[in-house]
Amino acid sequence: MTKSKLRILAVGSQNSGVTYHRLALPLSIMEKEYCLITDTITEELLKEKNFNVVVINRFLESVPLLQLLEWRQKFGFKLVVDIDDYWSLFDKHLSAGTYRKLGITRIIKDFIRYADLVTTTHNRLYLEIIQINKNCEILPNALPFDKDQFTAIKKDNDRVTIAHTGSITHYPDIQQLKRPIEELAKSRVFRENTRMLLCGWNEFNKWHWNQMGNLYTANEKLEYKIIESLPVDLYMNFYLEADMLLVPLLDNKFNRLKSNLKALEAGAKNIPILTYKRAPYDDIPTIFEVDNWERDIKRMAFSKQMRDDFGYRNGEYVREHYDIFKINEARFAIYSKLIE
């Protein structure tokens, strides 16, 4: 058996979900000679460790592209840029102003343009990327199901617990639930038998989180629980108490180019995911397709049989199609070919 020659430097932000899922998690369990996952890249590090592959997500904040390209020429490594989101934000995205002010969209496109290889999560993003760089490969998001934090272990609840997970960037998306949740809160039976679970709270965006909390609990008319953001290696604890997951994405190009990771997370816990039957979830046949949020939340909340059926079907599907060990076989082959 030929020993792997891959010496990989993966650079990403600490405690970043993107770094965790696209770099740290897959590379930590992939075959290689050596891999260092860090938030810092320096000339001294490149010289000392003799890396032949440098992998980053989107762009580097700490090192200009020109400097990185000079290092590539000097040390001979291959530059892999991983893209998991579209580089142009919609106007209501909370980071849209920052992207415009700092020119981040242009910066990301430049990193894509000069990469030796671009990897991405699905075909929709692939079709956007190859307009900039033809050297692109699809490596879907994937999980090590039934291992570590991705086991199906859950807590028993005294109420049906309805979860929303994610960062504050979903603030515009969750607005779609305002009226449906207000109507649900008028139902005594719903109030007495459910709990709203809002996960990811962060004091840094306190005003927006307060608004989301008020919306998701109908101004505290519904019983609720809020869980603060967790380290990436513990974040699946969000789902320990969840009986169903709501994913109300607005229909815009940025969201259509997102990945289906939430379906994988729900599947790891064998719980149903309620969302629209459109990208990024139209390739998951086991979602519960939402047509009317008020009606569909109520239907799922009031039927344990439905929750079990949709949850276990989703769990089976994602385990078959998004197993990280299978995806890593492709990742290993792609990286190995790159350094031949």
Predicted segments, located by residue:
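Donor nucleotide-sugar binding/catalytic pocket of nucleotide-sugar-dependent glycosyltransferases
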Residues: 113-149
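N-terminal pre-catalytic "stem/leader" segment of glycosyltransferase-like enzymes
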Residues: 1-60
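Membrane-proximal helix-turn-helix segments that form the acceptor-binding/catalytic region
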Residues: 70, 98-118
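Nucleotide-sugar-dependent
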Residues: 172, 231-238, 243-265, 274-284
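A charged, aromatic-enriched C-terminal amphipathic alpha-helix characteristic of glycosyltransferases
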Residues: 302-337
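Active-site proximal beta-strand in glycosyltransferases
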Residues: 72-90
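Conserved catalytic-core segment of nucleotide-activated headgroup transferases in glycan assembly
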Residues: 14-29, 144-148, 155-237
